Design a protein with these regions (language model features):
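Zn2+-dependent metallopeptidase catalytic domains
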Residues: 21-332
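Positively charged, low-complexity intrinsically disordered regions
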Residues: 4, 17, 25-26
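Classical eukaryotic N-terminal signal peptides for Sec-dependent ER targeting/secretion
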Residues: 1-10
Length: 332
């Protein structure tokens, strides 16, 4: 048994060390998107760093996934026993973190610091990120190793948290299409790619609609209660809009749906009418006009239904609740 386990164990150890080394040397200049720090240095991120960070990370992840799949496949063929938990989940979680971190940080920046350049970068990189995510979630060797471990007598010796992790992975992979074959698998992956693009379009419409909405306030009574810092931001926005003499003390103030402006208004402003106006504008954002998301939402709902049926569910509600504590019957 030890002779059979040693190659897989060696791969597992190598994987855990290779990520840090490969990512550290992926680019000649330190890239903050690859920084191994407790808090990401977002202030140092520039658009030109995104593409090399994501692409180098994906390249490392592709190779690491191949190594893991080969090791697991060899183990599954050579030994009828279960693959130990330590040789499946730790390298798998390391893989999730390594390839997902730069893309996740970029997605956050895209949401809070949107620009045409960042949108173009997202459009260029998204297909490769989605494709790798599909390959990872539909990996037969990983699924088979997890399934064998779940069905083995040694599963009972795992901690409750470890058992939960194995079962959650199995469920996530089933919902990710691992059991689909042939035309169904191709259709599922095609729909997932379309859904990713639609989700991006939805977010873009929301950002554009938020950016298009604003109000200029001129009376002090209208902004009573709003913190001074928020008023300075609103006055600065007014100056940029052409009100050169705008000040935090005397206005005018330009308020928008940006969180740094809207949140203080909704929390502290004594002007009930202004709070209601901004709340309703935020609640109905991208529901009409040039950035209307109505058709995008219809397509998203349609694809969700198609995916649910491909996975054996009657509707998307059942699919969504499959990962939640409440059952479908409990909420319908």
């Amino acid at each position: 048994m030890m002779r059979l386990l040693s190659p897989l164990l060696a791969v597992t150890v190598a994987l855990q060390f290779s990520y840090a080394l490969a990512l550290r040397h992926a680019t000649p200049v330190p890239n903050p998107l690859l920084a191994n720090t407790a808090l990401p240095p977002l202030a140092r991120v520039t658009p030109d760093q995104v593409k090399p960070a994501v692409q180098s990370t994906l390249a490392v992840a592709e190779n690491s996934l191949t190594d893991l799949e080969q090791a697991l496949s060899s183990k599954l063929k050579e030994d009828e026993g279960p693959v130990p938990y330590e040789q499946i989940l730790p390298p798998l979680l390391e893989l999730y973190d390594s390839y997902g971190k730069p893309w996740g940080l970029f997605s956050h920046l895209r949401a809070v610091r949107d620009s045409p350049q960042l949108r173009a970068i997202e459009d260029e990189l998204r297909p490769a990120v989605v494709a790798f995510g599909q390959r990872l979630s539909q990996s037969k060797p990983i699924y088979s190793a997890l399934a064998r471990l779940n069905q083995s007598s040694s599963f009972a010796s795992l901690t409750e948290a470890q058992q939960r992790a194995v079962r959650s992975e199995l469920l996530d992979r089933k919902l990710g299409g691992v059991a689909l074959e042939g035309a169904q698998a191709e259709e599922f992956n095609k729909l997932q790619r379309e859904l990713s693009e639609l989700s991006s379009n939805y977010s873009t419409n929301v950002l554009d609609a938020q950016a298009a909405w604003n109000m200029t306030l001129t009376a002090k009574d209208e902004v009573k209660g709003i913190p001074a810092r928020a008023l300075e931001g609103a006055a600065d926005a007014a100056r940029k809009a052409g009100h050169e003499k705008a000040t935090a003390e005397d206005g005018p103030w330009l308020v928008s749906l940006d969180g740094t402006v809207m949140d203080p208004v909704l929390s502290y402003c004594e002007n009930r009418e202004l709070r209601e106006t901004m709340f309703r504008a935020s609640d109905t954002v991208a529901s009409s006009g040039p950035h209307d998301n109505s058709e995008v939402l219809k397509k998203i709902l349609q694809i969700r239904q198609q995916n649910a049926e491909l996975l054996g569910f009657s509707n998307y509600d059942e699919l969504s609740l499959a990962t939640k504590m409440a059952s479908h019957d409990a909420v319908t």
